[in-house]
Amino acid sequence: MVHWSCEEKQFITSLWAKVNVEEVGGEALARLLIVYPWTQRFFSSFGNLSSPNAILHNAKVLAHGKKVLTSFGEAVKNLDNIKKTFAQLSELHCEKLHVDPENFKLLGNILIIVLATHFPKEFTPASQAAWTKLVNAVAHALALGYH
């Protein structure tokens, strides 16, 4: 179980309240696919992923990014029980989708970058530390289904 200070919780929840899930989620997933092109193999059904421009404007990428970030929002709502919150998603990604758990860390790092660019004033070093702790906790929870 991850232990959160009141300050960490405040950094996370106050910034999350400002996040446009559709915009930030789409951008984060698109960046993941551009920066780490080997992750595209999990999204072969999404159509044209042939260039950064194609990825950034791919409706399926943007929609799935929103879905991913909506799920991430469950971590924000359940900071004290992230493992349980992501148990089913962990099983899905492990047993059915066979996603390398390292990709969860990569996406978390990308999310940090996207949040920092969207909220430069709010994304102080202390806020970054709290968000880094959160994305690492989510990545760990999603990787628990791997044996």
From Swiss-Prot:
Source species: Chelonoidis carbonarius
Protein name as annotated: Hemoglobin subunit beta
Pfam families, A to Z: Globin
GO cellular component, one term: hemoglobin complex
Keyword vocabulary terms for this entry: Heme, Iron, Metal-binding, Oxygen transport, Transport
PANTHER family assigned to the protein according to its UniProt record, in alphabetical order: HEMOGLOBIN FAMILY MEMBER, HEMOGLOBIN SUBUNIT EPSILON
Assembly, per entry: Heterotetramer of two alpha-D chains and two beta chains.
Phylogenetic lineage: Eukaryota, Metazoa, Chordata, Craniata, Vertebrata
Function text: Involved in oxygen transport from the lung to the various peripheral tissues.
Gene symbol of the encoding locus: HBB
Disulfide partners: none
